[in-house]
From Swiss-Prot:
Protein name in UniProt: tRNA-2-methylthio-N(6)-dimethylallyladenosine synthase
Disulfide bonds: none
PROSITE patterns: MTTASE_N, MTTASE_RADICAL, RADICAL_SAM, TRAM
Designated gene of the protein: miaB
Cofactor note: Binds 2 [4Fe-4S] clusters. One cluster is coordinated with 3 cysteines and an exchangeable S-adenosyl-L-methionine.
Free-text function comment from the UniProt entry: Catalyzes the methylthiolation of N6-(dimethylallyl)adenosine (i(6)A), leading to the formation of 2-methylthio-N6-(dimethylallyl)adenosine (ms(2)i(6)A) at position 37 in tRNAs that read codons beginning with uridine.
Main location: cytoplasm
EC number: 2.8.4.3
Keywords: 4Fe-4S, Cytoplasm, Iron, Iron-sulfur, Metal-binding, S-adenosyl-L-methionine, Transferase, tRNA processing
Occurrences of domain MTTase N-terminal (ranges): 5-121
Domain (TRAM): residue spans on this chain: 373-435
Any one cellular-component term (Gene Ontology): cytosol
Positions that bind [4Fe-4S] cluster 2: C158, C162, C165
Cofactor requirements of the protein: [4Fe-4S] cluster
Length: 436
C-alpha cells in the first residue's frame, strides 16, 4: 500500500471556514490525503481564506510568499487557495503568485479532487463558479469529528447587501440546506460522539425548508437523543422571527447565548450601511429576546469609522452598547472592500478611527469583565473539550460560551458536568465540579 499523502490546511476567518476546511479535508481524503499540522511535511497546502477586511486578504498573500522556499525545496508540492479571497480574486492570485496550483471558491470545493487531478499535468486551475448543483450533494459523508462540539452549516450566502460587506459577492445568494439532510448529518455527528452542535450560516436565521424556520429546525434537532446543546451563528436582526425568539424560552437545549451583530447605534449610519433596521428596532428586539430567556448572554459586531460617521453617530453607538450590556463584542475599524457601495465614499482619518475604536473597546471590555464577574458563585453546565495545561485540569465551554478551567482529575473530553464558578480572569473562568 502506498504511503498516504499529507494535507495541511490553514483556516482564516469565520466558523463557516472551519466547517468548510473539515469538508475539504474529507473530500481530499478520497484522494488518499490525511491531515498534518506541519506545513513542511505536506504534499498539499491549502489556505482557506477570509475577505472581510483588507488585512485578512493581504495576509494570505504574505503567507503565500512564505511558502516559496517550501515550494522550491519540494517542486511537487501542490498549493491551493480556497475561500472568499479565492472567490474575489480568482485568476489574479495565479498572476501574483506563480507558486499557486489551484484556486477554488467556497461554492466549488466539492470539485477539489477533480481540480487536483488536472494539476498533475502541470495545469493551473481556477474554479470560482456558482454551480447549479448543491456542493453538499457531492461531498462524502462526514466521518471524523474533532471533539464533542461540532459545526453544521445550514445556510450560506446573504441577500442583505450591507454597503460594507463582500459576502453577497463571495458567497452568493442565500441558500438553505434541506431539512432532511441536516437532520441526517446531525444524527451522524451525534453517533460519532458529538454532544453540542452550532448551526452556521452567513445569515443563519434566514434558514427555511419545508415550511420551517430556524426555530422549527432547532426544535426538531433537540429531539435527537444524545444531542445536549444547540447554538447558532451569525444572525441578522431582521430575521429574528417569533418562533426563533420563542425557542430561546421553550427549548432547554438551546444555550443562553446569542451573537446578534448591530454594527452601529446611529440610525443615520445604519441607513448608510443599508442595514434595513434602526437602533430602536434592535433595542426592542433585545427586550423580546431577554423576556424569553432572561439569562441570555448577548454579543455583537461593531464597525467604527464608517464613511460619514460623526462624533454624534459614534456616541449613539456607545449609548446603544450601554443600553444593551454585551458579554463581549467584535469591533473593527471600517475597511473598504473593492466592489462594495461604501468603497466609493471618502474614508475618515485613520487617527479618528483609531481613537474611536479604542474608546468602544474599552467600554465593551468593561462590560465583558462585569459579565464574567457576575458568573462567580453561579452553577453552570460545562462541556469538556480538552485537557488543561495543568495536571488534572479540564477545559470546556459553559452554557454562555465562556471558557472554563476546572480541576477534575477524573474528567474526560466529552463529559457534560455541573460546575460552580469560583473565579474570573480576563478571558476565562475557573470553577469546581459539583457532585464529583
Amino acid at each position: 500500500m502506498s504511503e498516504a499523502r499529507k494535507l495541511f490546511i490553514k483556516t482564516y476567518g469565520c466558523q463557516m471556514n472551519v466547517y468548510d476546511s473539515e469538508r475539504m479535508a474529507e473530500a481530499l481524503g478520497a484522494k488518499g490525503y490525511v491531515l498534518t499540522e506541519v506545513a513542511e511535511e505536506a504534499d498539499m497546502v491549502l489556505l482557506n481564506t477570509c475577505h472581510i477586511r483588507e488585512k485578512a486578504a493581504e495576509k494570505v498573500y504574505s503567507d503565500l510568499g512564505r511558502l516559496r522556499p517550501l515550494k522550491t525545496a519540494k517542486p511537487d508540492l501542490k498549493i491551493g487557495v480556497a475561500g472568499c479571497v479565492a472567490q474575489a480574486e480568482g485568476e489574479e492570485i495565479l498572476k501574483r503568485m506563480p507558486l499557486v496550483d489551484l484556486v477554488v471558491g467556497p461554492q466549488s470545493y466539492h470539485r477539489l479532487p477533480d481540480m487536483l487531478d488536472r494539476t498533475e499535468g502541470g495545469a493551473r486551475v481556477v474554479d470560482t463558479d456558482f454551480p447549479e448543483e448543491d456542493k453538499f450533494d457531492h461531498l462524502p459523508e462526514r466521518k471524523a469529528t474533532r471533539g464533542p462540539a461540532a459545526f453544521l452549516t445550514v445556510q450560506e450566502g446573504c441577500d442583505k447587501f450591507c454597503a460594507f460587506c463582500v459576502v453577497p459577492y463571495t458567497r452568493g445568494a442565500e441558500v438553505s440546506r434541506p431539512f432532511a439532510r441536516l437532520m441526517a448529518e446531525a444524527r451522524g455527528l451525534v453517533e460519532r460522539g458529538v454532544r453540542e452542535i452550532t448551526l452556521l450560516g452567513q445569515n443563519v436565521n434566514a434558514w427555511s425548508s419545508d415550511g420551517r424556520g430556524l426555530g422549527g429546525l432547532i426544535r426538531e434537532l433537540a429531539r435527537i437523543d444524545g444531542l445536549e446543546r444547540l447554538r447558532y451563528t451569525t444572525s441578522h436582526p431582521n430575521d429574528m422571527a417569533d418562533d426563533l425568539i420563542e425557542a430561546h424560552g421553550a427549548e432547554p437545549k438551546l444555550m443562553p447565548y446569542l451573537h446578534l451583530p448591530v454594527q452601529s447605534g446611529s440610525d443615520r449610519i445604519l441607513k448608510a450601511m443599508n442595514r434595513k433596521h434602526t437602533a430602536e428596532h434592535y433595542l426592542r428586539l433585545i427586550e423580546r429576546i431577554r423576556a424569553a430567556r432572561p439569562d441570555i448572554l448577548l454579543t455583537s459586531d461593531f464597525i467604527v469609522g464608517f464613511p460619514g460617521e460623526t462624533e454624534a453617530d459614534f456616541e449613539a453607538t456607545l449609548d446603544l452598547i450601554r443600553a444593551v450590556g454585551f458579554g463581549s463584542a467584535f469591533s473593527f475599524k471600517y475597511s473598504a472592500r473593492p466592489g462594495t457601495p461604501a468603497a466609493e465614499k471618502p474614508e475618515l482619518p485613520g487617527e479618528v478611527c483609531d481613537a474611536r475604536l479604542q474608546r468602544l473597546q474599552a467600554l465593551v471590555t468593561e462590560q465583558q469583565r462585569a459579565a464574567q464577574m457576575a458568573m462567580v458563585g453561579r452553577e453552570v453546565g460545562v462541556l469538556y473539550e480538552k485537557a488543561g495545561r495543568l495536571p488534572g485540569q479540564m477545559v470546556g465551554k459553559s452554557d454562555h460560551l465562556h471558557a472554563v478551567h476546572v480541576e477534575d482529575k477524573a474528567g474526560r473530553v466529552g463529559d457534560l458536568v455541573r460546575v460552580r464558578i469560583t473565579a474570573s480572569a480576563p478571558n476565562s473562568l475557573a470553577g469546581e465540579r459539583l457532585g464529583a
